[in-house]
C-alpha cells in the first residue's frame, strides 16, 4: 500500500461511495479516517453507531457540505480531485466489498448476517442459555422445597392420627372400666336386697357419684392437654414455614444480585472490548495512512510526541514501522481535564490577587488615616508652641518667592522655640550639604493626579514620586508630589547650627509629613487586574537612603508582611534632570536641586514632564511595558 494505486481504480471506488472524503478537507489523518468511518456507517444504515462516533470524538469529524464540489475548506493542498488518501481509501473499501459483498445491509436481500451481527447474536444466545439454566436451577430448588414441605405435612398428619387413635383407645378403656364397675355395682345391689332399702340406695349413690365425677374431670383434662399440644404443634409448623419462606426470599435476592453483577460485568467487558477494538482500528489506520499532517510528515510528528526518556522507541533509518506503532491518539477527556485544571488555577490566582489587593487597600486606608491624625497633631502642637504667630501657609504650586520667605521666617521662629520637631532634612540636601529650609507642614498635593508641575514654576522644586493616599481609577501609577523650596542665604542666629548639629530623639510619627524620602511606586487596580501573584513578584533594589530615617516609615515600607522589603525607585528622566538642576543653581537660589537618582527601569517610559500641573490625569506618567509578557509563559500566554 506504499505506492498509490492507478486512477481508474480510485474513480471506480469513489463512485461506490455516496460522500467521498478528500485531503482538501483536512490535513489531519485521524480526522479523515473518522470521516470515512462516519460516511461508511451512514451509507450502511448504521445511524446509531455514526452518532456514537460523533459523540465520542467531540464532533471533530469534518462533514461534507451541500455544494457540488463536496467541501468548502480553503486548506492548502493539490488541486487534483483524486488525491492519494481518497484513492487509497476507495481502493480499500472496494476490496472489502468485493471480498464480502454482504457487508452492506442495504444491498443484502438474502438476510445473511455480518460478522458483527453474528457476534451480537451469539452473545444473546449465550445470555439466554445462562438465563434458562438459572431458571431451571431455581425451579429445581423450588420443587425440592415443596417436596420437603409435603413430607413434613404427611408426617405431622400421621402423628396427629396416632395421637387421636391413642386418645380414642384411652376413652374406650375408661368407658369399659365404667361399664365393668356399673355391672359390679348392679351385682352388689342384687346381693344386698335383703338389707334396708334406704341404706342400700344411699350407699349405691355415694359409691357411684365420686367415680363418675372423677372420670369426667380426667377426660376433660386429657382433652385440654391434647388441644394445647395441637396448638403448639401448629405454631411450630407456622414458624418453620415462615423461616423457610424467608430463606427462599433471601436466596432469590442473592441470585438476582449475582445475575445483575454478572450482567454489569459482561456489559463492561463488552464496552471495553469495543473501545479497544475501535482504538486499535484507529491506531492501525492512522499508522498505515501516509498522509501529510499540517505540512509535516507523520514520522516527524510521532518523533516529537515521544518522550525524550525512551531511547529505545526512537526511529532507526532501517525500521520505519516502529515509528508508526508508537503513536498514541490523544483522548478528548484528558484535554478537557487539562482545560478545567487551567481554568481552576486561573480562578484561584484571581481570588488570591483580589484578597491581596483588598488587604493592600485596607492597609493604605489605615495609613492615610494615621497620616491625617499625625497632621492634626502636628498642627495643634505648632499652634500651641507659637500662639502669637499665624499658621504657616501651604504653597500649592510655589509661584512666588514672597510666600517662600514668609514660610522660612515662620519656620525659623518655630525652630527657635522647638528645635526637636525640625530635626531631619531630606537626603538630597544632605548630599549637597547646603542650608535649605523645609516648611513645618507637609506640602502635599490635594489630588494624586498632578504628577509633575509646570516647567516654568518648577525651577525651585525637586520632583519625586511617593505613595499617594488616593487610588486612581485610570492610570497605572499613583504619585504624591512633595516640593522643596530653596531659601536665600540669610544670617542665621547661633541657635540654628546647634539645632542642626544636635541629634536629639524626636517623635518620628509626627515627622512623617516633613520628610522627602526616595519615592516608592504603587501599583493600582489597573496593574493588579492581571493574573499575577504578588508572592511570585520579585521586587527591585531600593536605595539606602531610607535606612537612617528611623521607624517613621514602617507603615510605608511594610506593604507586604511588614518587613523591610526592596522597593521600586523612579527618578526624573536624565534629560529633564540635566535641564532643571543647572537652572536652579544658576538662579542663585542657594543650592537648589537634589542629586540625580538612578533609573532602574530601562523598559519603562514616563511622560514628557511638561504638564501644566492643573490636576489633569491625561498628563500623568504611564508605564508602557507589557507586564504580562515579561512575567513568564504558560498554557495561557502562548
Swiss-Prot record:
Domain of life: Eukaryota
This protein's UniProt keywords: Activator, Cytoplasm, Nucleus, Transcription, Transcription regulation
Biased segments, Basic residues type: 412-423
Biased composition (Low complexity): 296-328, 369-387, 394-408, 425-465, 495-515, 572-585
Bias kind Gly residues: ranges: 586-595
Start and end residues of each LisH domain: 29-61
Disulphide connectivity of cysteines: none
Assembly, per entry: Interacts with FLO8.
Function: Transcription factor that regulates pseudohyphal differentiation, invasive growth, floculation, adhesion and starch metabolism in response to nutrient availability.
Similarity remark: Belongs to the MSS11 family.
Name of this chain's protein: Transcription activator MSS11
The gene coding this protein: MSS11
Amino acid at each position: 500500500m506504499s505506492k498509490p494505486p492507478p486512477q481508474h481504480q480510485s474513480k471506480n471506488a469513489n463512485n461506490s461511495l455516496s460522500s467521498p472524503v478528500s485531503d482538501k478537507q483536512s490535513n489531519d489523518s485521524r480526522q479523515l479516517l473518522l470521516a470515512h468511518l462516519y460516511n461508511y456507517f451512514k451509507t450502511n444504515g448504521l445511524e446509531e453507531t455514526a452518532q456514537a462516533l460523533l459523540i465520542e470524538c467531540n464532533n471533530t469529524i469534518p462533514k461534507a457540505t451541500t455544494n457540488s464540489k463536496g467541501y468548502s475548506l480553503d486548506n492548502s493542498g493539490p488541486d487534483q480531485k483524486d488525491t492519494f488518501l481518497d484513492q487509497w481509501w476507495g481502493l480499500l473499501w472496494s476490496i472489502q466489498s468485493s471480498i464480502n459483498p454482504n457487508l452492506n445491509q442495504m444491498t443484502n436481500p438474502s438476510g445473511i448476517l455480518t460478522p458483527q451481527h453474528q457476534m451480537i447474536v451469539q452473545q444473546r444466545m449465550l445470555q439466554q442459555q445462562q438465563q434458562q439454566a438459572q431458571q431451571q436451577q431455581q425451579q429445581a430448588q423450588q420443587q425440592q422445597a415443596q417436596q420437603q414441605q409435603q413430607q413434613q405435612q404427611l408426617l405431622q398428619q400421621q402423628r396427629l392420627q396416632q395421637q387421636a387413635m391413642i386418645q380414642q383407645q384411652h376413652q374406650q378403656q375408661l368407658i369399659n372400666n365404667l361399664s365393668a364397675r356399673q355391672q359390679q355395682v348392679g351385682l352388689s345391689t342384687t346381693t344386698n336386697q335383703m338389707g334396708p332399702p334406704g341404706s342400700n340406695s344411699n350407699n349405691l349413690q355415694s359409691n357411684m357419684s365420686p367415680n363418675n365425677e372423677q372420670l369426667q374431670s380426667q377426660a376433660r383434662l386429657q382433652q385440654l392437654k391434647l388441644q394445647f399440644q395441637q396448638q403448639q404443634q401448629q405454631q411450630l409448623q407456622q414458624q418453620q414455614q415462615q423461616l423457610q419462606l424467608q430463606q427462599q426470599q433471601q436466596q432469590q435476592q442473592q441470585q438476582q444480585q449475582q445475575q445483575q453483577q454478572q450482567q454489569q460485568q459482561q456489559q463492561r467487558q463488552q464496552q471495553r472490548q469495543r473501545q479497544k477494538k475501535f482504538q486499535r482500528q484507529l491506531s492501525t489506520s492512522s499508522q498505515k495512512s501516509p498522509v501529510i499532517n499540517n505540512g509535516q510528515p507523520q514520522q516527524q510528528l510521532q518523533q516529537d510526541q515521544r518522550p525524550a526518556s525512551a531511547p529505545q522507541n526512537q526511529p532507526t533509518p532501517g525500521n520505519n514501522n516502529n515509528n508508526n506503532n508508537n503513536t498514541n491518539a490523544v483522548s478528548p477527556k484528558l484535554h478537557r481535564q487539562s482545560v478545567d485544571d487551567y481554568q481552576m488555577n486561573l480562578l484561584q490566582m484571581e481570588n488570591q490577587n483580589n484578597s491581596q489587593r483588598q488587604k493592600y487597600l485596607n492597609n493604605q486606608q489605615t495609613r492615610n488615616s494615621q497620616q491625617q491624625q499625625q497632621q492634626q497633631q502636628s498642627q495643634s502642637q505648632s499652634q500651641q508652641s507659637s500662639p502669637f504667630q499665624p499658621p504657616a501657609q501651604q504653597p500649592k504650586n510655589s509661584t512666588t518667592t514672597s510666600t517662600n520667605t514668609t514660610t522660612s521666617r515662620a519656620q525659623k521662629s518655630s525652630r527657635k522655640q522647638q528645635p526637636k520637631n525640625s530635626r531631619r532634612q531630606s537626603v538630597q540636601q544632605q548630599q549637597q550639604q547646603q542650608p535649605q529650609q523645609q516648611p513645618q507642614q507637609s506640602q502635599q498635593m490635594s489630588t494624586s493626579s498632578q504628577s509633575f508641575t509646570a516647567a516654568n514654576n518648577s525651577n525651585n522644586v525637586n520632583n519625586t514620586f511617593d505613595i499617594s493616599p488616593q487610588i486612581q481609577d485610570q492610570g497605572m501609577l499613583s504619585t504624591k508630589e512633595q516640593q522643596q523650596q530653596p531659601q536665600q542665604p540669610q544670617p542665621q542666629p547661633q541657635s540654628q547650627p546647634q539645632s542642626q548639629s544636635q541629634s536629639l530623639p524626636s517623635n518620628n510619627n509626627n515627622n512623617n509629613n516633613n520628610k522627602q524620602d526616595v519615592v516608592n511606586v504603587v501599583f493600582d487596580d489597573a496593574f493588579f487586574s492581571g493574573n499575577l501573584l504578588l508572592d511570585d513578584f520579585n521586587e527591585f533594589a531600593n536605595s539606602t537612603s531610607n535606612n537612617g530615617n528611623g521607624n517613621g516609615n514602617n507603615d510605608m515600607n511594610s506593604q507586604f508582611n511588614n518587613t523591610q522589603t526592596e522597593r521600586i525607585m523612579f527618578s526624573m528622566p536624565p534629560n529633564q534632570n540635566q535641564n532643571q538642576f543647572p537652572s536652579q543653581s544658576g538662579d542663585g537660589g542657594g543650592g537648589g536641586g537634589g542629586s540625580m537618582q538612578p533609573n532602574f527601569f530601562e523598559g519603562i517610559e514616563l511622560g514628557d514632564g511638561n504638564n501644566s500641573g492643573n490636576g489633569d490625569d491625561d498628563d500623568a506618567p504611564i508605564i508602557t511595558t507589557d507586564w504580562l509578557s515579561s512575567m513568564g509563559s504558560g498554557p495561557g500566554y502562548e
